[in-house]
From Swiss-Prot:
The active site is at 922, 991, 1151. DNA-dependent RNA polymerase catalyzes the transcription of mitochondrial DNA into RNA using the four ribonucleoside triphosphates as substrates. Component of the mitochondrial transcription initiation complex, composed at least of TFB2M, TFAM and POLRMT that is required for basal transcription of mitochondrial DNA. In this complex, TFAM recruits POLRMT to a specific promoter whereas TFB2M induces structural changes in POLRMT to enable promoter opening and trapping of the DNA non-template strand. Has DNA primase activity. It comes from the Eukaryota. One of its GO terms (biological process) is transcription initiation at mitochondrial promoter. It is found in: Mitochondrion. Changing residue 250 to D: In COXPD55; results in mild reduction of transcription of mitochondrial DNA in an in vitro assay. The keyword Protease does not apply. One of its GO terms (molecular function) is sequence-specific DNA binding. Its main location: mitochondrion. This is DNA-directed RNA polymerase, mitochondrial. Residues 802-1230 are annotated as: Mediates interaction with TEFM. The gene is POLRMT.
C-alpha cells in the first residue's frame, strides 16, 4: 500500500492513481484532471511546488469525494464494496501510448519497487501548462463558487452498504445461501433460525457489548455518540445511513466493540416501521454474530415488522415460542417496552394472528401514595375545597391557544422598554444597513449549512460518525434564524465559546422536540385533552368529583408526552461547536459601514480571542466593535426570547412523571441537574410512580398560581430606569454612567508603582463597566417582560433541584428575583380582606421595613398606625413626597404594600376590599429550626421560635450577645483584639455567619464574611480587621456550640457518615420524607473531554461518568446542608398540598411562604402542623437504616463497611424538647 503516496490535495490523489515514472496528460474539463491540472514531477522547483501546494489545499473540499476510492483500495478487510464509476483524468499506462488507465482493483504491493522511466516530454508539458494555467484557474474558481450538490457526491462515492459482513463463517454461509434463494420464504426461515439459535462468543476478541439495560452513564463517549446517531437517523428518515454505519462498524473488529444491543435495536425498529423484513433480518444476523441476546425491544421490532408485512402465522408463532423459552413474557411487550400507539397496534395485530383471544393487560386503577405524611392529602373522606381560577372556561381556552402558538414558534418578540425616541435619519439608516447585512448573513448561513451537511454526509458514507442527521432535524431556515437570534443577543463584551456552543445545542434540541410533536399528531391530542382538563380549573365549569390536577389528567387518559432523551453531552458540545463556528465563518460585513457599497474588503462580524478567568484560558467570541456600534445606533425596538424563558399564558400541564409536565410542548426536566449528569433522571425513572406523587402534586400546585403585573409599581420603576436608573433603589444605571478609564499615557520613564496603579485603576473601571452592563441587561429583560405581560394573567411553571427545592422555570421574571421583581408581581386572583386581613397587611408592611423585627405583633401593628401618614404619603407621592418607603430594607415591596394599605383604609368597607398583594411569613433561621427539631434541642428550639414566646426570639441577636460575653471576659484578661472590638459586635456583624453555619460554611468562609462586615464599619480601625475577624469567627462557632449542642452533634454525624461513604467509593444517597430520591453529584473532575479542531478546542467535564471517584471534601461538606434543604423542601410541599386542599393560594420562596392577607392565619396553622408531623417521623433513624442497607450490604466490602456501619448506627440521641409546643408558637413563621 506504500505505492499510494496519499496527500490532502489533488497532487496526492493523482500520484496515487498515476503509474510510477510517467507524466499524465491534461485532463478534460469536469474530470479530476480538469480540476487539478497536470502535475509536475518531484524535480520541479521549490517555488513551483509551493504554488502547487497552495492550489492543492484550496481544492481540498471539492476533491475530498475522491478520497473514498483510495480508502476503499486500502480497506482490504471490507469484502463487499460496490463502487459507482469514478471518473478521473486519463493517464498514460506504463509502456503504453493509448493514454488511458482504469483505476486498479487492488494496488500491488510491489509497486513501490517500480523503476522510474525517464521522461522526454516534460518540456512540452511545462510549456502547455503555462499557456493553459490562467484559463484553468478561472474555470476552477467558477466551479468552486457553484454549490456542491449532494447528487454529485452520490454519483462519485460508493453506495450505502446493506448486507453485513459477518465474522462467523457459519452465519455468513447461512446469509449467503439465503440471498441466493427466492426472495420470499428464506427470510422467514432465517428469522426463525436466528431467534432459536443461542448466541455464543465467536472468539476472545469479540466481547459482549454492554446490555441495553445499562444506563447511559456506563457507555463511553463514543458509544453515546453512536447511539444518539442511530436514534436521530430514525427521526430524520435517514435509516439507510444508520444501517450503513452499523454494517461498517460491525464488519471491523475494533469498531464492533463499540456497538451495543440498543444500537442494533434502534435500527431494527426503524426497519420494522417501514416493513422492511429483509433488512431487519440483516440486523438480526449482526446481533447473533456479535454474540448478543435479543431482548423485548428486539422481539417487538420483529413482531411489528411481521404485522406490517402480514406474515404467516408460523413465523410469528415460532417467534413467540422463542420469547417464552428465553423467559420473556408476552404481556411485557406492551407494559415494559416504550412504543408509540401505532407501533403497539401493529405488534398486537401480529400477535392476534397466533393468539386471537389475546388482549392487552387491563389498565390498573391509578396507584395511590400510601405514605403516612400524605395520607390526609389523598384521603377521599373529609372536607375538600380545591380552589378554582377566577377565569371562565372560554377565556382559558383562548389563553391555551395563544400559549400553544407561542411554543410552536419557539420564540417570543417583546417590545424593549429602553427610552423610546422618534427614529432619526441616522437611526433609520442604521436599521436599513442592519437589515441588509442580516439578509446577506441569512443567505451565507444557508449556503454554509448546506455545504456542511454535504461534507458531513460524505463522512457517514465513508463509515464515520458525523453530526449530519442532527443538522437535518430542523429546517435550514429555522437553524439560520436561530443563529441570527443568538448573534443579535450576544453581549458587547462577548461570550464564552463553550457557553455559546452549549446554548446553541440546547436550542436546537428544544426546537426539535416541539417540531416532532407537531408532525406526530401530539399537538392535536394535547388540544383535545387540555380543553377537558380546563373544566377542573375554570370558574364556570364543574367536574363530577373534586380531585387534584394530576389525578384528573390521568383520569382523562391524557396522552403520555414523548420521551425524548436529551442528547449525550459529547454530541451536544460537538453540535454546538459546529454551529458556533459556522456562525463565525459565514457572517461578514464591510470593513467600513459608513460606505458599505464602496468597501470591497470584508471583515468577520465575530472574532475569537482568549481571556484568563481564574488562571484558566477561556476562548471568547466577541462581536466586532463596528457591529456593536451599529446595533446601538439602530436601537431596535424589540427583544427576542425563547418561549421557555417567558411565563406561560395558560395553566401549566400537571406534572405526572419525571418527563411530563410544565410547558405544553417544550421539554422541561422535573429535576435540575449539573450539566451532563444523568444519575438524577435515572433515579427518578426507576423510582416507584407513587413515591413521587407528593412532589409532583406540590410542583403542580405552585405552578397553578395565577399572577399579574402591579402596573403602578412598574410605571415608577420604568420612570427611573429610563432616567439613567437609581442604583440605591436597585434600578441599574446604563453603561454610559460607568466610571471612565484613565486616559493618561505614561512616559516610559514613569515609576513602576505608577504604572501598576494605572493598570489597577483601568482593571477596576472595566470590571465595574461589565457589572453595570450585566445588571442593566438583566433589568431590561425583566422590565420588558413585565411591560409585555401588563394587563395579562400568566403562570410560572415550577421544577426542583436535586435536593427537592423548588424553582420557577422562567428565569428572567419570577418571584424568586430581587426586591424590584417581587414588587412587580401580585396574585391575579384577589380575595376580600375579611376581619383580620388589613391587620396582616400592616404587619407585613412593618416586616418589610425591617424596623421592628424583635417586637411582638401588637407593637408592629401599633407602629403601622403611628406612621400611617408616611404610608399614605408614600402611596400618593412616591417620588415627590417624603419618600419614607425608600428607607426600608425592601423599598419597592414596601411601596407596593403602602399602596395596598392606602387602597384598603380608604375603601368604604375595608373588610370587603379585594386584595391581590401576597403577604409573606418567614421562618426564623429555618435551617436551625430543622436541626433543633431533629435533635429535640430545648435551648436551640427556644432560640429559633420553636417554643411559644410573648416576643419573637432573634437567634442572631442571641449569638451576638453570647459573643459579647466571651469578648468581655477576654478583654478583662488583657487581650488586645477583644478590647478593640468593644461596641462593634452587633447583630449585623454575625448574622451572615450564623445563617450559613447551618449550611456548612467553614471557619475560613465565616472569617471572610465577618471581615466584609467589619470593613463596612467606617469607625472600626482597619488595621485590626484581619485579627478581629479571626477572633470573632472562633467566638461565633463557640457560641453556636453552646447554644445548639444537639445541632452540632447531628452535623458532625452527617459529615462523618458522608466521609466514610466517599472513602468506600460511593456518593451519598438518601430519600426525602416525601419519597424523592436524592444523590449528591460531586465527583472528582478527572475525566475532562476535549473536542479538537476548528477555531478552538473545547474541554468539558463529563459529569455523567459514574466511574469517577467521589469528591470526598464536597460530599462530606455538602451532606449536612443538602439534607436540611431536603427537609425544608418536604415541609414546604406538605404545607402547599394542605393549603391547596383548604382552598388557599400558596407560593413560596424556599422558607418564605406567601398567601392572601385574609388567609395568613390559616396558612400559619397549616405550616406549624405540618412541621410537627414531619418531625414526628423518625427521620434520622430512617436515614440510618437506609444508608446501612444501601452501603453496608455488599459481601465483598464487609470489612471496609464495619466502621461505616458502626458510625451510621450511632445516631445522635435526641433531647427532651416537646414538638407539640411548635403548634402554639406564634413566631415560628412570622
Amino acid at each position: 500500500m506504500s505505492a499510494l503516496c496519499w496527500g490532502r490535495g489533488a497532487a496526492g490523489l493523482k500520484r496515487a492513481l498515476r503509474p510510477c515514472g510517467r507524466p499524465g496528460l491534461p485532463g478534460k474539463e469536469g474530470t479530476a484532471g480538469g480540476v487539478c491540472g497536470p502535475r509536475r514531477s518531484s524535480s520541479a522547483s521549490p517555488q513551483e511546488q509551493d504554488q502547487d501546494r497552495r492550489k492543492d489545499w484550496g481544492h481540498v473540499e471539492l476533491l475530498e469525494v475522491l478520497q473514498a476510492r483510495v480508502r476503499q483500495l486500502q480497506a482490504e478487510s471490507v469484502s463487499e464494496v460496490v463502487v459507482n464509476r469514478v471518473d478521473v483524468a486519463r493517464l498514460p499506462e506504463c509502456g503504453s501510448g493509448d493514454g488511458s488507465l482504469q483505476p486498479p482493483r487492488k494496488v500491488q504491493m510491489g509497486a513501490k519497487d517500480a523503476t522510474p522511466v525517464p521522461c522526454g516530454r516534460w518540456a512540452k508539458i511545462l510549456e502547455k501548462d503555462k499557456r493553459t494555467q490562467q484559463m484553468r484557474m478561472q474555470r476552477l474558481k467558477a466551479k468552486l463558487q457553484m454549490p456542491f450538490q449532494s447528487g454529485e457526491f452520490k454519483a462519485l462515492t460508493r453506495r450505502l452498504q446493506v448486507e453485513p459482513r459477518l465474522l462467523s463463517k457459519q452465519m455468513a454461509g447461512c446469509l449467503e445461501d439465503c440471498t441466493r434463494q427466492a426472495p420470499e420464504s428464506p427470510w422467514e426461515e432465517q428469522l426463525a433460525r436466528l431467534l432459536q439459535e443461542a448466541p455464543g462468543k465467536l472468539s476472545l476478541d469479540v466481547e459482549q457489548a454492554p446490555s441495553g439495560q445499562h444506563s447511559q452513564a456506563q457507555l463511553s463517549g463514543q458509544q453515546q455518540r453512536l447511539l444518539a446517531f442511530f436514534k436521530c437517523c430514525l427521526l430524520t428518515d435517514q435509516l439507510p445511513l444508520a444501517h450503513h454505519l452499523l454494517v461498517v462498524h460491525h464488519g471491523q473488529r475494533q469498531k464492533r466493540k463499540l456497538l451495543t444491543l440498543d444500537m442494533y435495536n434502534a435500527v431494527m425498529l426503524g426497519w420494522a416501521r417501514q416493513g422492511a423484513f429483509k433488512e431487519l433480518v440483516y440486523v438480526l444476523f449482526m446481533v447473533k454474530d456479535a454474540g448478543l441476546t435479543p431482548d423485548l425491544l428486539s422481539y417487538a421490532a420483529a413482531l411489528q415488522c411481521m404485522g406490517r408485512q402480514d406474515q404467516d402465522a408460523g413465523t410469528i408463532e415460532r417467534c413467540l415460542e422463542q420469547m417464552s423459552q428465553e423467559g420473556l413474557k408476552l404481556q411485557a411487550l406492551f407494559t415494559a417496552v416504550l412504543l408509540s400507539e401505532e407501533d403497539r397496534a401493529t405488534v398486537l395485530k401480529a400477535v392476534h394472528k397466533v393468539k386471537p383471544t389475546f388482549s392487552l393487560p387491563p389498565q390498573l386503577p391509578p396507584p395511590v401514595n400510601t405514605s403516612k405524611l400524605l395520607r390526609d392529602v389523598y384521603a377521599k373522606d373529609g372536607r375538600v375545597s380545591y380552589p378554582k381560577l377566577h377565569l371562565p372556561l372560554k377565556t382559558l381556552q383562548c389563553l391555551f391557544e395563544k400559549q400553544l402558538h407561542m411554543e410552536l414558534a419557539s420564540r417570543v418578540c417583546v417590545v424593549s422598554v429602553e427610552k423610546p425616541t422618534l427614529p432619526s435619519k441616522e437611526v433609520k439608516h442604521a436599521r436599513k444597513t442592519l437589515k441588509t447585512l442580516r439578509d446577506q448573513w441569512e443567505k451565507a448561513l444557508c449556503r454554509a449549512l448546506r455545504e456542511t451537511k454535504n461534507r458531513l454526509e460524505r463522512e457517514v458514507y465513508e463509515g464515520r460518525f458525523s453530526l449530519y442527521p442532527f443538522l437535518c432535524l430542523l429546517d435550514e431556515r429555522e437553524v439560520v434564524r436561530m443563529l441570527l437570534q443568538v448573534l443579535q443577543a450576544l453581549p458587547a463584551q462577548g461570550e464564552s465559546f463553550t457557553t455559546l456552543a452549549r446554548e446553541l445545542s440546547a436550542r436546537t434540541f428544544s426546537r426539535h422536540v416541539v417540531q416532532r410533536q407537531r408532525v406526530s399528531g401530539q399537538v392535536q391530542a394535547l388540544q383535545n385533552h387540555y380543553r377537558k382538563y380546563l373544566c377542573l380549573l375554570a370558574s364556570d365549569a364543574e367536574v363530577p368529583e373534586p380531585c387534584l390536577p394530576r389525578q384528573y389528567w390521568e383520569e382523562l387518559g391524557a396522552p403520555e408526552a414523548l420521551r425524548e432523551q436529551p442528547w449525550p453531552l459529547p454530541v451536544q458540545m460537538e453540535l454546538g461547536k459546529l454551529l458556533a463556528e459556522m456562525l463565525v465563518q459565514a457572517t461578514q460585513m464591510p470593513c467600513s459601514l459608513d460606505k458599505p457599497h464602496r468597501s470591497s474588503r470584508l471583515v468577520p462580524v465575530l472574532y475569537h480571542v482568549y481571556s484568563f478567568r481564574n488562571v484558566q484560558q477561556i476562548g471568547i467570541l466577541k462581536p466586532h466593535p463596528a457591529y456593536v456600534q451599529l446595533l446601538e445606533k439602530a436601537a431596535e425596538p424589540t427583544l427576542t426570547f425563547e418561549a421557555v424563558d417567558v411565563p406561560m399564558l395558560c395553566p401549566p400541564l400537571p406534572w405526572t412523571s419525571p418527563h411530563s409536565g410544565a410547558f405544553l410542548l417544550s421539554p422541561t426536566k422535573l429535576m435540575r441537574t449539573v450539566e451532563g449528569a444523568t444519575q438524577h433522571q435515572e433515579l427518578l425513572e426507576t423510582c416507584p410512580p407513587t413515591a413521587l406523587h407528593g412532589a409532583l402534586d406540590a410542583l403542580t400546585q405552585l405552578g397553578n398560581c395565577a399572577w399579574r403585573v402591579n402596573g403602578r409599581v412598574l410605571d415608577l420603576v420604568l420612570q427611573l430606569f429610563q432616567a439613567k436608573g437609581c442604583p440605591q433603589l436597585g434600578v441599574p444605571a446604563p453603561p454610559s454612567e460607568a466610571p471612565q478609564p484613565p486616559e493618561a499615557h505614561l512616559p516610559h520613564s514613569a515609576a513602576p508603582a505608577r504604572k501598576a496603579e494605572l493598570r489597577r485603576e483601568l482593571a477596576h473601571c472595566q470590571k465595574v463597566a461589565r457589572e453595570m452592563h450585566s445588571l442593566r441587561a438583566e433589568a431590561l429583560y425583566r422590565l420588558s417582560l413585565a411591560q409585555h405581560l401588563r394587563d395579562r394573567v400568566f403562570w410560572l411553571p415550577h421544577n426542583m433541584d436535586f435536593r427537592g427545592r423548588t424553582y420557577p422555570c422562567p428565569p428572567h421574571f419570577n418571584h424568586l428575583g430581587s426586591d424590584v421583581a417581587r414588587a412587580l408581581l401580585e396574585f391575579a386572583q384577589g380575595r376580600p380582606l375579611g376581619p383580620h386581613g388589613l391587620d396582616w397587611l400592616k404587619i407585613h408592611l412593618v416586616n418589610l421595613t425591617g424596623l421592628k423585627k424583635r417586637e411582638p405583633l401588637r407593637k408592629r401593628l401599633a407602629f403601622a398606625e403611628e406612621v400611617m401618614d408616611d404610608i399614605l404619603d408614600s402611596a400618593d407621592q412616591p417620588l415627590t413626597g417624603r419618600k419614607w418607603w425608600m428607607g426600608a430594607e425592601e423599598p419597592w415591596q414596601t411601596l407596593a404594600c403602602c399602596m395596598e394599605v392606602a387602597n384598603a383604609v380608604r375603601a368604604s368597607d375595608p373588610a370587603a376590599y379585594v386584595s391581590h398583594l401576597p403577604v409573606h411569613q418567614d421562618g426564623s433561621c429555618n435551617g436551625l429550626q430543622h436541626y433543633a427539631a431533629l435533635g429535640r434541642d430545648s435551648v436551640g428550639a427556644a432560640s429559633v421560635n420553636l417554643e411559644p414566646s410573648d416576643v419573637p426570639q432573634d437567634v442572631y441577636s442571641g449569638v451576638a450577645a453570647q459573643v459579647e460575653v466571651f469578648r468581655r471576659q477576654d478583654a478583662q484578661r488583657g487581650m488586645r483584639v477583644a478590647q478593640v472590638l468593644e461596641g462593634f459586635i452587633t447583630r449585623k456583624v454575625v448574622k451572615q455567619t450564623v445563617m450559613t453555619v447551618v449550611y456548612g460554611v467553614t471557619r475560613y468562609g465565616g472569617r471572610l464574611q465577618i471581615e466584609k462586615r467589619l470593613r463596612e464599619l467606617s469607625d472600626f480601625p482597619q488595621e485590626f480587621v484581619w485579627e478581629a475577624s479571626h477572633y470573632l469567627v472562633r467566638q461565633v462557632f463557640k457560641s453556636l456550640q453552646e447554644m445548639f449542642s444537639g445541632t452540632r452533634a447531628i452535623q458532625h454525624w452527617l459529615t462523618e457518615s458522608a466521609r466514610l461513604i466517599s472513602h468506600m467509593g460511593s456518593v451519598v444517597e438518601w430519600v426525602t420524607p416525601l419519597g424523592v430520591p436524592v444523590i449528591q453529584p460531586y465527583r472528582l473532575d478527572s475525566k475532562v473531554k476535549q473536542i479538537g479542531g476548528g477555531i478552538q478546542s473545547i474541554t468539558y467535564t463529563h459529569n455523567g461518568d459514574i466511574s469517577r471517584k467521589p469528591n470526598t471534601r464536597k460530599q462530606k461538606n455538602g451532606f449536612p446542608p443538602n439534607f436540611i434543604h431536603s427537609l425544608d423542601s418536604s415541609h414546604m410541599m406538605l404545607t402547599a398540598l394542605h393549603c391547596y386542599r383548604k382552598g388557599l393560594t400558596f407560593v413560596s420562596v424556599h422558607d418564605c411562604y406567601w398567601t392572601h392577607a385574609a388567609d395568613v392565619s390559616v396558612m400559619n396553622q397549616v405550616c406549624r402542623e405540618q412541621f410537627v408531623r414531619l418531625h414526628s417521623e423518625p427521620i434520622l433513624q430512617d436515614l440510618s437504616r437506609f444508608l446501612v442497607k444501601r452501603f453496608c450490604s455488599e459481601p465483598q466490602k464487609i470489612l471496609e463497611a464495619s466502621q461505616l456501619k458502626e458510625t451510621l448506627q450511632a445516631v445522635p440521641k435526641p433531647g427532651a424538647f416537646d414538638l407539640e409546643q411548635v403548634k402554639r408558637s406564634t413566631y415560628f413563621f412570622s
